[in-house]
Regions:
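Residues at helix-coil transition
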Residues: 8, 129, 172-173
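Juxtamembrane/interface motifs at transmembrane-helix termini
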Residues: 34-35, 39, 85-88, 112-115, ...
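Charge-rich, acidic-biased intrinsically disordered regions
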Residues: 143, 148-149, 173-174, 202-207
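C-terminal effector-binding regulatory domain of bacterial HTH transcription factors
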Residues: 176-207
């Protein structure tokens, strides 16, 4: 629950948090709260400063750049595999995912919209036998997830949906070059909005 609140920006970057407040919020004892704080500190989602307190970490664009570099390296291989391995049933599942995304977007359901996005990418990795790769990505994606929340809540996401649709078309056509090209285009859409978010949410980002 604490990680969910951090990722979804219900707790803002820079906010001070205390064990007592979290115990009251979640209705649990200090021990699991303390353990969660230490784990999230290791994941760079919480900053701990002796004699100052515990704070929600700022969004680190350098860390996100490094994460996206790793993701692009993995997706170069995964998109190639998807063009070889995905069955008609796999393709149908991905197309239904896109339909569901559009439905949730129309109903302004941000949580389910983001869930569809995550499921789309996870499904491709798993269908290609790369569950472990996907786990590595998810374990390091929390900083990036906050950018996704900003993107989904403030930017028209029609182009993101089109990327997914075009990607499925490329998989179905076994067009490896096109699939990877679309994957890179998809990632760049988030990077393109960094400067806009820095202006709109200056207090969210690491200086």
């Amino acid at each position: 629950a604490l990680l969910y609140n951090l990722v979804n920006l219900e707790m803002k970057p820079g906010d001070k948090i205390t064990e007592s407040d979290l115990c009251e919020l979640y209705g649990i004892s200090r021990t699991p709260i303390r353990e969660a704080i230490l784990e999230l500190h290791q994941q760079n989602m919480i900053d701990i400063y002796p004699k100052q307190g515990t704070f929600v970490s700022y969004i680190d664009t350098a860390a996100i750049d490094e994460f996206l570099e790793l993701r692009n390296l993995m997706e170069q291989s995964v998109t190639q595999l998807a063009c070889e391995k995905l069955t008609p049933d796999n393709i149908a599942y991905l197309r239904e995912n896109i339909v569901q995304w559009k439905h949730h977007l129309k109903n302004d359901n941000l949580a389910k919209t983001q869930a569809c996005d995550k499921e789309f990418h996870k499904y491709i990795y798993c269908a290609c036998g790369k569950q472990f790769w996907h786990n590595i990505i998810r374990e390091n994606a929390y900083q990036f997830d906050r950018i996704v929340i900003l993107m989904f809540s403030s930017i028209n996401t029609d182009k993101l949906i089109k990327d997914h649709s075009d990607m499925v078309d490329a998989f179905e056509a076994h067009d490896k070059e096109k699939a990877y090209e679309i994957s890179l285009r998809h990632t760049k859409r988030y990077i393109e909005h960094f400067d806009e978010f820095l202006v709109k949410y200056p207090n969210y980002f690491k200086k």
